[in-house]
C-alpha cells in the first residue's frame, strides 16, 4: 500500500501574475501528484478563505500583500507532519484530518488554498500510483460523459476594465454532436465576434478569462453582437436544434447589490454616463437601478428576446427569496445557476434544494476547499436533479483538474473560459485528449445536459 512520503508546497504565479500555491505529494513508491490552486476575483462572502500574506512577515514580498507564503508554510510545517505516512488512497480520511486540523468553518486558520492544494495533489498521486487518468480514479468505470462547454467570449464586471456590468457572456453549442465539434463551432463564433467588434470600432483586448472586453453601452448591445457573430459563423442562435448555439450569462449580481438600499446598480455603465464618455452622452435616461423584482423582470425581457439558456447569479447571494421567485418564473425554460448563493457548500445546497432557489449549481473546488466536500456537493445536487456546472476561476494556471472532474462525475457541463489564453485552452485540450482516450465509450449529451429544465 503506497503511503505519503513527502508533501511539499511552493509559491507560483497564476494567470493574473498573482501568487498562488502549488503542492507536490510524493509516495514511498516515488510517484508524485502535483496540483495548482486557482483564485477568484468575484467571490462569494461564504466561500472558504484563501489565505494571503497581508499582515504577516511576508507582506512586502508581493504587491498588496498577495503572497501565499503563509499558506505554503502551513502545508510544509503543519499539514505535512500530520499526513506523511498515511495511505495515498485514503482521500476522505486525509481531507477530514485537514478539516479538523484547521477547525474553522471557512478553513481560515490553515487556508483553503493550502488544504485544497494538498487534497488535489493526493488524488493525483493516487491516480498515478494506479497508472490511470484522474477522471477514471475519481469517477470509476462510469466516467464517460464529455461536458458541453460554456465559453466566455465577452467579459465584463470584475473580470474586465470596461463599461459592461454583467460579468460573463457565454456561448453554448447546444446543437453540437461532440466536444470537438462544440469547440470548432465556438472557435468560429469567437473569431467572427472579433471581426464584428473591430468593425464597430471596439478593441479586441481580452479580460481575465479570455473573452473580449469592449466598452459596450448596454447588455443588449453585447447580446446583439453575440447573435450576429453566431449567424455569420453559419450557425443558428437558438436554445435547441441542429447547429444551434445558445447564450449563457453570469450576471454576478452580488457585485451590483447594495445591502442598505436593497437595490442593484449597473455601476460601470452609470460611471461611464456620469463621466460623459464619448458615445455615452445620450444615455442619461437609461434605467440603472433595479429592485429584486425589477431585475427579475429585466431578465425575463432578455430571455424573450435572445436565445438565453442559462443565467448564473442573476441576484445577490443574500437574496434567497428572489432566487426562488426567479426559478419559479423561468426555471422551466432557463437554467438558473447558483454560484455565490451556495459556494459549492453541501449545507447551503441543502437550503437551496429546500427553498427551490435554483435548478443548477456551479462547482468550484476552491470555494469549499477539499475534493471530498466537492464530491459531496455534486452528489447531493445530482440526487436533487440539479445540473452541475464544473467551473474554473478568473485566476487560473495550467492545471487541468476541473476537466477530469467534469468527466469523472458526468456533470455534462463545464465553464472554463474563452477561445484564448493558455490557462483556459489547457482545460479544453485536456478534454480533447479525454475524448480521444474514451473513444466509443464516450458520450456527449449536448442539449441533453439541461435535464434540469422542465
UniProtKB/Swiss-Prot annotation:
Predominant location: cytoplasm
Residues reported in the UniProt entry to bind (2R)-2-phosphoglycerate: 167, 364, 393-394, 415
Reaction it catalyzes: (2R)-2-phosphoglycerate = phosphoenolpyruvate + H2O
Keywords, ordered alphabetically: Cytoplasm, Glycolysis, Lyase, Magnesium, Metal-binding, Secreted
Binding residue positions for Mg(2+): 250, 312, 339
EC assignment: 4.2.1.11
Annotated signal peptide: none
Record flagged with keyword Manganese: no
Active site: 209 (proton donor), 364 (proton acceptor)
Cofactor note: Binds a second Mg(2+) ion via substrate during catalysis.
GO MF term list: magnesium ion binding; phosphopyruvate hydratase activity
Record's keyword annotation contains Nuclease: no
GO cellular component: cell surface; extracellular region; phosphopyruvate hydratase complex
Alphabetized CDD domains for the sequence: enolase
Example of a GO biological process term: glycolytic process
One Pfam family linked to the record: Enolase_N
Subcellular location(s) of the protein: Cytoplasm; Secreted; Cell surface
Protein family per UniProt: Belongs to the enolase family.
Function in brief: Catalyzes the reversible conversion of 2-phosphoglycerate (2-PG) into phosphoenolpyruvate (PEP). It is essential for the degradation of carbohydrates via glycolysis.
Protein name: Enolase
Species in which this protein is naturally found: Mycoplasmopsis agalactiae (strain NCTC 10123 / CIP 59.7 / PG2) (Mycoplasma agalactiae)
Lineage of producing organism: Bacteria, Bacillati, Mycoplasmatota, Mycoplasmoidales, Metamycoplasmataceae
Amino acid at each position: 500500500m503506497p503511503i505519503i512520503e513527502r508533501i511539499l508546497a511552493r509559491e507560483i504565479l497564476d494567470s493574473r501574475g498573482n501568487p498562488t500555491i502549488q503542492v507536490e505529494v510524493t509516495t514511498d513508491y516515488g510517484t508524485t501528484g502535483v496540483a495548482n490552486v486557482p483564485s477568484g476575483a468575484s467571490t462569494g462572502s461564504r466561500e472558504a478563505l484563501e489565505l494571503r500574506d497581508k499582515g504577516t512577515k511576508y507582506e512586502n514580498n508581493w504587491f498588496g500583500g498577495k503572497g501565499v507564503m503563509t499558506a505554503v508554510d502551513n502545508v510544509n510545517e503543519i499539514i505535512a507532519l500530520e499526513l506523511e505516512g498515511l495511505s495515498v488512497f485514503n482521500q476522505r480520511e486525509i481531507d477530514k484530518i485537514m478539516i479538523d486540523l484547521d477547525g474553522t468553518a471557512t478553513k481560515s486558520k490553515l487556508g483553503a488554498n493550502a488544504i485544497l492544494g494538498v487534497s488535489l495533489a493526493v488524488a493525483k498521486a493516487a491516480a498515478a500510483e494506479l497508472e490511470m487518468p484522474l477522471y477514471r480514479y475519481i469517477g470509476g468505470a462510469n466516467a464517460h460523459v464529455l461536458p458541453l462547454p460554456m465559453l466566455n467570449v465577452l467579459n465584463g464586471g470584475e473580470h474586465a476594465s470596461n463599461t459592461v456590468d454583467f460579468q460573463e457572456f457565454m456561448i453554448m453549442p447546444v446543437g453540437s454532436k461532440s466536444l470537438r465539434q462544440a469547440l470548432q463551432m465556438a472557435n468560429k463564433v469567437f473569431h467572427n465576434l472579433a471581426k464584428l467588434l473591430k468593425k464597430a470600432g471596439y478593441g479586441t483586448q481580452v479580460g481575465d478569462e479570455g473573452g473580449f472586453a469592449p466598452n459596450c453601452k448596454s447588455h443588449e448591445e453585447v447580446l446583439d453582437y453575440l447573435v450576429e457573430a453566431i449567424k455569420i459563423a453559419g450557425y443558428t442562435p437558438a436554445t435547441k436544434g441542429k447547429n444551434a448555439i445558445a447564450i449563457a450569462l453570469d450576471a454576478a449580481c452580488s457585485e451590483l447589490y447594495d445591502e442598505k438600499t436593497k437595490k442593484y446598480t449597473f455601476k460601470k455603465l452609470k460611471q461611464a454616463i456620469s463621466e460623459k464618455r464619448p458615445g455615452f452622452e445620450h444615455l442619461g435616461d437609461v434605467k440603472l437601478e433595479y429592485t429584486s423584482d425589477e431585475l427579475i423582470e429585466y431578465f425575463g425581457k432578455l430571455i424573450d428576446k435572445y436565445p438565453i439558456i442559462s443565467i448564473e447569479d442573476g441576484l445577490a447571494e443574500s437574496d434567497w427569496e428572489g432566487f426562488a421567485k426567479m426559478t419559479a418564473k423561468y426555471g422551466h425554460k432557463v437554467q438558473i445557476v447558483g454560484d455565490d448563493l451556495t459556494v459549492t457548500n453541501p449545507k447551503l445546497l441543502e437550503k437551496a434544494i429546500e427553498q427551490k432557489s435554483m435548478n443548477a449549481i456551479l462547482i468550484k473546488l476552491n470555494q469549499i476547499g477539499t475534493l471530498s466536500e466537492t464530491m459531496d456537493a455534486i452528489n447531493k445536487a445530482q440526487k436533487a436533479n440539479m445540473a452541475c456546472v464544473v467551473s474554473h476561476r478568473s485566476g487560473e494556471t495550467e492545471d487541468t483538474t476541473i476537466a477530469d472532474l467534469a468527466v469523472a462525475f458526468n456533470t455534462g457541463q463545464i465553464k472554463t473560459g474563452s477561445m484564448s489564453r493558455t490557462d483556459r485552452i489547457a482545460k479544453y485540450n485536456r478534454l480533447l485528449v479525454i475524448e480521444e482516450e474514451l473513444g466509443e465509450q464516450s458520450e456527449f449529451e449536448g442539449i441533453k445536459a439541461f435535464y434540469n429544465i422542465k
